[in-house]
């Protein structure tokens, strides 16, 4: 898959995952309100949709290449000698 198509697919999957998570959270909240009279058995599906949305989000980040950039910067910030603060170097 070309880089442009992979990036587009990753962004679509991340967007779809976000929508699925928000809809799942929204339905879970609305299901708790008695005036809407929503079926209780859909509540389990709403909780499951939060996890499905998170998996879609992570898959999109992996396909689109966003995951590697975040990992690299986290690794550099925490473990690279050039970026770590040491007590030996103190500025006056």
From Swiss-Prot:
<protein>
    <recommendedName>
        <fullName>Uncharacterized protein YchH</fullName>
    </recommendedName>
</protein>
<dbReference type="GO" id="GO:0044011">
    <property type="term" value="P:single-species biofilm formation on inanimate substrate"/>
</dbReference>
<dbReference type="InterPro" id="IPR019698">
    <property type="entry name" value="DUF2583"/>
</dbReference>
<dbReference type="GO" id="GO:0071276">
    <property type="term" value="P:cellular response to cadmium ion"/>
</dbReference>
<dbReference type="GO" id="GO:0070301">
    <property type="term" value="P:cellular response to hydrogen peroxide"/>
</dbReference>
<dbReference type="Pfam" id="PF10762">
    <property type="entry name" value="DUF2583"/>
</dbReference>
């Amino acid at each position: 898959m070309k880089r442009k198509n992979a990036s587009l697919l990753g962004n679509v999957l991340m967007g779809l995952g976000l929508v699925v998570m928000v809809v799942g959270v929204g339905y879970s909240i609305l299901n708790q309100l008695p005036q809407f009279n929503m079926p209780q058995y859909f509540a389990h599906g709403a909780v499951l949709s939060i996890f499905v949305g998170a998996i879609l989000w992570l898959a999109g980040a992996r396909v689109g290449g966003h995951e590697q950039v975040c990992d690299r910067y986290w690794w550099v910030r925490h473990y690279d000698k050039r970026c770590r603060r040491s007590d030996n170097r103190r500025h006056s």
